[in-house]
Amino acid sequence: MDEEHKLNFLDNCYDDDFCTGEHFTVLRALARDADPYIRAEAAAAAVNFTHPDTKALLLLLTRDEEELVRAEAYDSLSVFPCDEVAQCLTNAMEEEWEPLARSYAILSWADVTVGLCRDLSAAAETVRDMQRQPCGEHVRLTLWYALCRLGQEDALTQIAGFLCSRDYHIRCAAVAFLDALSDEARRPMAEKSIREALAQETAKSVLSAIETHFPGAM
């Protein structure tokens, strides 16, 4: 299969009717492709398969040598709330050396922890311990995402503070998080923060993110 056919196959994986056992066999082969981009796309597409081996494939990809592949695998594992996945993500939060991959591990860990109905107060303390350690801005942002998922009241306000980051990638992520995490009661605060950020925002990608997530603010 040449690269064009591989990419077409991976695009088709986002069609529910396409995600059969036969096609999972092809996906599993692409997850071992020599091209890390293909492996990463396979990890991202795997989330759409209900095949019993999907989880095992993603756990394997969390050990890939390429950061992007690991990041996509961590991201896709968010839909598997089970002890094995929770332990994998916990290990990644502590041991993952690349910030992008570590951030995705934190995001999925929070979702899996909530899905498992674990002791959220103990989980929140784990996150606060991580906040006391040196880490980059993207990891700090995702730690606040985790705390918000775990029920910490002021976490959404802390996330809004990242709208002032000098890094537009961080600002884009903050916009998406504010949308995802703001329920009906907290939506007005999120929208107010977005409108304030709009007064000084010039980056097209951030403006596009705001238009997507908060169309009423534009």
Regions found by a protein language model. Name each.
Residues 40, 44-47, 71-79, 103-104:
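Conserved alpha-helical positions within TPR/SEL1-like repeat arrays
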Residues 1-48, 208-218:
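N-terminal alpha-helical scaffold/docking segments in eukaryotic complex subunits
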Residues 11-14, 47, 78, 110, ...:
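Structural signature of alpha-helical solenoid repeat scaffolds
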Residues 96-118, 129-136, 201-214:
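Long alpha-helical HEAT/HEAT-like repeat alpha-solenoid scaffolds in very large eukaryotic proteins
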